[in-house]
Amino acid sequence: MATRYWIAALPVADDNVAAGKTALWARLQEAISRHSFDTPLYRFTVPDLRPGTLDSLLALSDDLVKSNIFIEGVSHKIRRQIEDLERAGGVEPGTLTVDGVPVDSYLTRFVWDEGKYPVNAPLKETVASIQSQVAKIEDDMKVRVAEYGNVKSQLGAINRKQTGSLAVRDLSNLIKPEDMVTSEHLVTLLSIVPKYSQKDWLASYESLDTFVVPRSSKKLYEDNEYALYTVTLFAKVVDNFKVHAREKGFQIRDFEYSPEAQESRKQELEKLLQDQEVMRTSPIAMGAMLATVRVFSSWDAFSSAVRVFVESILRYGSACTVPVCCPSTIYKEREKSKEHLGRAMRQYQQLLEI
């Protein structure tokens, strides 16, 4: 269920700022409830930030549009990465929380963090700090995801070698020591025979060269396309045998049996599987979730707070305003309610819609 938020700043005309804010808040609540009774209204408190000059505010207004687009893009990208990781682990995407509370609660109870963003700092510096932090988070996530992608790629390559056809797959896990004969003069070759040419292979392999050991061929494995056969012959005629086998439509796979190499490949696979699981459940997934929380809080809260402050000054001047946050859930059946809400906000000089 998607939730849409409107952030609006309205001018306070009363000389008594406190009384004016209270009266404006009451009138706004009455208007919203009259036009859209199912839309709750929350205060969105923005501190008295340092506005700077008119020229700086105009420039900052343009920068904030670009900044919000950038931060929003990073937030969505990281969120998609989290969902992909969760699906890869066989779990349903979880609910995003900020500082341990749901997103809705975080926004409707937003409090400006003066320790992170001092209110007396120039707004340009505050915006630059927000964007810099988001850019750093994005760079960190790129490195993490690249590492995870590299492990996935290696596992994919190994999996293709183990599950592909006999013409291309790794044969090491199909061969036993007793299947291979290796001596000073004799060698065992592995022949990939088309599934429907096995009779032809058995009838002809001994005649492909005069130095083939009779009745030495044995079938080790068969898939949907090919069968894997061994054949033992004298080492000096290997090249000649390969040529004749190829002419008959049989593929001789280059293979050297090595228990050490086989064990090494097994350990490599186990390590990659372990690395993938650790990355998915720890540094990548948790890092992505933490990154999303940080980006979300920067984009949907602080960046939006700065933007509504800047736009309110540009539109209403330095007069005091009371920012409010109006969430509206978007459903087709609530389109009429949405229109009523928009009409009510326009009546109260809606400033900003996000």
From Swiss-Prot:
UniProt keywords, alphabetically: Hydrogen ion transport, Ion transport, Membrane, Transport, Vacuole
Any one Gene Ontology molecular-function term assigned to this protein's record: proton-transporting ATPase activity, rotational mechanism
Primary location: membrane
Keyword Membrane: yes
Entry's Gene Ontology cellular component terms: vacuolar proton-transporting V-type ATPase, V1 domain
Subunit text: V-ATPase is a heteromultimeric enzyme composed of a peripheral catalytic V1 complex (components A to H) attached to an integral membrane V0 proton pore complex (components: a, c, c', c'' and d).
Function: Subunit of the peripheral V1 complex of vacuolar ATPase. Subunit C is necessary for the assembly of the catalytic sector of the enzyme and is likely to have a specific function in its catalytic activity. V-ATPase is responsible for acidifying a variety of intracellular compartments in eukaryotic cells.
Protein name: V-type proton ATPase subunit C
Gene: VATC
